């Protein structure tokens, strides 16, 4: 079985879940790469900015192009899509943090790097990257187990702000909470 990285921002994860998680999408730049992914492949869903594994999607179709908005309310740039079976869909606070030692020390992309090192993140910059089979199997089984157990991994204040897309700013009139769009929501 082949395992592929599927990156989501907190916003696109939220939009996908609200639409039932039956379709996953990628940018038009990944059209050729998507054509090489076959039915029954596994997408391991990784929530960027909070660094958590949050889902398993199994492809039930070949890739196709569809411009209907799913992942953004308008101007959705994730138009190369797959129909998928949402095998595991976790809330962010149930997502598996990559920096948990039992995960970090197992994955080929991270195990030889210090947790504080920024170099590990280079592996998590683009969706559709094929994962080492051993890592894919490990995460697949771990996510299935987490889907059953639903162990909570509490979000930090920072992670909660990222997920809610809110931050506090200080102005001459005092502190104010403001919405911050994800990078993928800015034209």
Provide a role label for each language-model segment:
Residues 52-60:
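Short, ligand-facing micro-motifs at secondary-structure edges
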Residues 2, 53, 80:
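Residues that flank catalytic or metal-binding motifs in active/ligand-binding sites
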Residues 46-52:
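Short, charged beta-turn/beta-strand-edge "cap" motif at the junction between a beta-strand
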């Amino acid at each position: 079985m082949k395992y592929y990285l599927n990156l989501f921002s907190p916003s696109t994860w939220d939009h996908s879940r609200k639409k039932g998680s039956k379709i996953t999408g990628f940018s038009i730049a990944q059209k050729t790469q998507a054509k090489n992914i076959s039915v029954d492949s596994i997408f391991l869903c990784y929530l960027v900015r909070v660094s958590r594994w949050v889902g398993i999607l199994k492809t039930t179709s070949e890739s196709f192009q569809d411009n209907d908005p799913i992942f953004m309310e308008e101007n959705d740039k994730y138009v190369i899509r797959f129909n998928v079976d949402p095998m595991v869909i976790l809330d962010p606070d149930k997502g598996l943090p990559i920096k948990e030692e039992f995960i970090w020390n197992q994955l080929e992309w991270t195990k030889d790097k210090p947790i504080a090192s920024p170099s590990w993140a280079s592996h998590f910059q683009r969706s559709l990257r094929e994962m080492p089979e051993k890592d894919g199997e490990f995460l697949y089984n771990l996510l299935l187990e987490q889907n059953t157990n639903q162990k909570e991994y509490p979000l930090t204040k920072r992670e909660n702000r990222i997920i809610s897309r809110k931050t506090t700013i200080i102005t001459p009139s005092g502190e104010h909470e403001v919405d911050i769009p994800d990078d993928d929501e800015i034209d």
